Amino acid sequence: MRKLFIATLGFEEKFVIRSLIRSGLSRGDSIIIFAPKGYTEDDKSLRAAETIKEIVSRILPDINMRIEEYDLQGDFAEEIFRIRNVIQSYQFDEIIACLSGGMRALILGVISILLTLNGYPITIEVEFENLERYVRIPLNVLKIPYNSRWVTVLEYLASGKSVRAISKDTRLSPATISRIISEMRLYRLVDEDNKLTEEGYFYVKMYKKVFQKKET
């Protein structure tokens, strides 16, 4: 799968570099670093950008990298349209977005753009300031509506139960369970073997308590 790695530029390069290494990029993948328009006039931002370019050229020589200036002073919606076209000009199967650095307005702009994109997995990664840990969120899952039946079936699948066993426990027909699984597969919550994906586990954890409260 071809990856498009995007990141927001701040005063330090360490967050971008650490995320790049974790992402496991290889030949055929691409990198876009979004920087505020006029970033070259700021010594810290320019130094961070130059360091990123130098390290990428050394450890990922076969990967195309681009620094795209983001106009934070212009029309917000028009800039979303422009940057979305920049992203869609690339060929990729998934997006990894490192949003650990940069101005809040820049991060908001990039998140807004990512929310308008459909058709491929998008993972947002944010690292703690002390570098002790990082958070990864499958953005697509946040756009999937809550469905109590989906939560139930996902929990059964996570425990290793078959369609027939789930049908027996829930008193829903095997055909209904299979249809629910097919629906969830369209949202990448389960794979072809009816195993939960990363998105599926995230969905269950995010809505499990909501489901339990509604049941009680």
Residue ranges and their predicted role:
Residues 1-94, 108-111, 115-216:
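Long, low-complexity, Lys/Arg-enriched
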Residues 93-101:
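Short N-terminal targeting/anchoring amphipathic segment
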Residues 104:
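Polyanion-engaging groove/track-forming segments
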